[in-house]
Amino acid sequence: MSSGGLLLLLGLLTLWEVLTPVSSKDRPKFCHLPPKPGPCRAAIPRFYYNPHSKQCEKFIYGGCHGNANSFKTPDECNYTCLGVSLPK
């Protein structure tokens, strides 16, 4: 294969890696945790990854004793657990 062909193949593989969403085996384990509002009484909107619907969903966080499946924005949740960003 010519060097141009190898360069093209390398470029395509790199593009594939960047554009391929996170597979379930590569997804951080905490993305499979259920939402945990915690016992405190604040009402902070947060987002968690729901492995059943395969999307990030809103929940209300109490402000303490939550878990790692709690994100401030849907974009942060989508990037971390799905490997994609929503269009702006």
Swiss-Prot record:
Molecular function in Gene Ontology: calcium channel regulator activity; potassium channel regulator activity; serine-type endopeptidase inhibitor activity; toxin activity
Highest taxon listed in the record's lineage: Eukaryota
Site, as annotated: Reactive bond for trypsin: R41, A42
Tissue expression profile of the protein: Expressed by the venom gland.
Maturation-removed propeptide residues: 87-88
Cysteine pairings via disulfide bonds: C31-C81, C40-C64, C56-C77
Assembly behavior: Heterotrimer composed of an alpha-neurotoxin-like peptide of 8 kDa (AC P0CJ35), a neurotoxic phospholipase of 16 kDa (AC Q7LZG2) and this serine protease inhibitor of 7 kDa at an approximate stoichiometry of 1:1:4; non-covalently linked.
Protein name: Kunitz-type serine protease inhibitor taicotoxin
Protein species of origin: Oxyuranus scutellatus scutellatus (Australian taipan)
